């Protein structure tokens, strides 16, 4: 799911109708705008809430007070250091690019000064890499994780806390460090990790139990893999049916929330509900199907998240410059949509090539930029 959400994030930043339309807004351009907006908003905007849900669940899964220091230490290397380094890279890159007239229009910035104040602004306000607002929020959520655990550890208090956050979001009682909606996503996943882990993971547990029963063993071992790396065990029929039913219910809830979210003057709470419902629905369906083995190019989540914006910006703006004579035409609309839907694949390919290069020739740099993540399982 991390890789799927990474693709959604790329589409959020891939919107390009304004670059190719030449100011045209009717006919084919209106259709192109609706298509890209639906994908970028309807699907793309669930990515970061999905990241919050997964990050929180993994943090609080098997959590206890004696593990807090270890959890914090691991997040320093996997979240904090990459956040600081990537923001500095973006700042230095923009600063250098802004001094070359030929590419200044591509980066879209005037000459950027080099100063301690600007470096601090780049890191503390993610001024040159707005995509890192997610990691910025995640850092604060990790800091307050002991408070969240203390609240959700008790079932009743945890539910009261989540209901309180729902009302806070509805009443626009906003915080910045962290945002109220981010705190809601993180707390919901924490509650499930502490109290409802069996519900979340029962499909995998039943599949493993079924395989062990069929093979006459009680050993705790993984089901075998076939020649392609797929799990060779067969998911029990009743598990598939239940996951499909849960996924179908999730689809109906998601559609209902989406329609309410898109209504004029809709309450922001519907947006939060929609952005929670879709990742949970994806998880329900994923538990009922036999997923292929995770490939190395799917494991570059942090690196892909960090670098995709550069790739998207240069491909979109570069293509728009090359085809500027077609701006506003039907051909340009077709080009914009083709580029839009190809950008995730382009970003993944470019990111993976760079990742393989770093892993082979600069492994220390790769560890820092990826937060210690590995391409190979």
What are these regions (language model features)?
Residues 1-61, 82-83, 87:
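Functionally critical transmembrane alpha-helices in membrane proteins and complexes, commonly lining
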Residues 10-14, 162-175, 249-260, 307-314:
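Aromatic-anchored segments of alpha-helical transmembrane domains
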Residues 12, 86, 90, 145, ...:
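Alpha-helical transmembrane segments of multipass membrane proteins
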Residues 35-48, 123-137, 169-188, 256-281, ...:
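Interfacial loop-to-helix transition and helix-capping segments at the boundaries
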Residues 41-50, 62-96, 106, 110-126, ...:
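Transmembrane alpha-helical segments and their boundary/interface "anchor" motifs
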Residues 59-66, 147-153, 190-201, 282-290, ...:
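Structural signal for the C-terminal ends of transmembrane alpha-helices
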Residues 184, 194-303, 309-319, 326, ...:
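Alpha-helical transmembrane segments and terminal signal-anchor/GPI-anchor hydrophobic tails
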Residues 362-377:
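Membrane-proximal cytoplasmic C-terminal regulatory module of class A 7TM GPCRs
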């Amino acid at each position: 799911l991390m890789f799927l959400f990474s693709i959604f994030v790329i589409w959020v930043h891939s919107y390009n109708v304004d670059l190719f339309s030449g100011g045209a807004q009717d006919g084919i351009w209106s259709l192109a705008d609706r298509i890209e907006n639906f994908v970028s908003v309807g699907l793309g905007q669930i990515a970061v809430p999905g990241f919050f849900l997964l990050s929180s669940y993994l943090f609080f899964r098997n959590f206890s007070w004696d593990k807090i220091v270890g959890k914090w230490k691991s997040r320093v290397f996997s979240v904090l250091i990459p956040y600081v380094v990537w923001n500095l890279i973006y700042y230095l890159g923009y600063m250098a690019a802004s001094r070359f007239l030929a590419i200044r229009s591509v980066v879209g910035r005037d000459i950027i000064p080099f100063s301690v104040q600007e470096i601090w602004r780049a890191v503390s306000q993610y001024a040159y890499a707005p995509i890192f607002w997610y990691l910025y929020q995640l850092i604060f959520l990790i800091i307050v994780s002991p408070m969240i655990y203390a609240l959700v550890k008790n079932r009743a208090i945890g539910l009261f806390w989540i209901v309180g956050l729902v009302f806070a979001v509805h009443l626009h009682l906003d915080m910045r460090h962290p945002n109220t909606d981010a705190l809601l996503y993180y707390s919901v996943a924490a509650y499930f990790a502490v109290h409802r882990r069996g519900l979340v993971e029962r499909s995998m547990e039943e599949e493993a139990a079924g395989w062990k029963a069929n093979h006459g063993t009680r050993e705790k071992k993984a089901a075998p893999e076939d020649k392609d790396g797929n799990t060779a065990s067969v998911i029990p029929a009743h598990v598939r049916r239940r996951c499909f039913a849960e996924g179908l219910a999730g689809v109906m809830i998601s559609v209902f929330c989406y329609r309410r979210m898109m209504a004029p003057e809709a309450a922001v709470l519907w947006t939060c509900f929609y952005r929670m419902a879709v990742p949970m629905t994806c998880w329900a369906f994923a538990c009922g199907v036999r997923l292929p083995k995770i490939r190395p190019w799917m494991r570059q989540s942090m690196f892909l998240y960090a670098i995709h914006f550069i790739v998207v910006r240069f491909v979109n703006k570069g293509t728009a410059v090359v085809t500027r004579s077609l701006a506003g035409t039907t051909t340009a609309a077709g080009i914009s949509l083709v580029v839009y839907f190809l950008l995730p694949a382009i970003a993944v390919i470019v990111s993976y090539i760079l990742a393989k290069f770093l892993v082979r020739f600069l492994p220390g740099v790769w560890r820092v930029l990826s937060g210690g993540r590995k391409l190979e399982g």
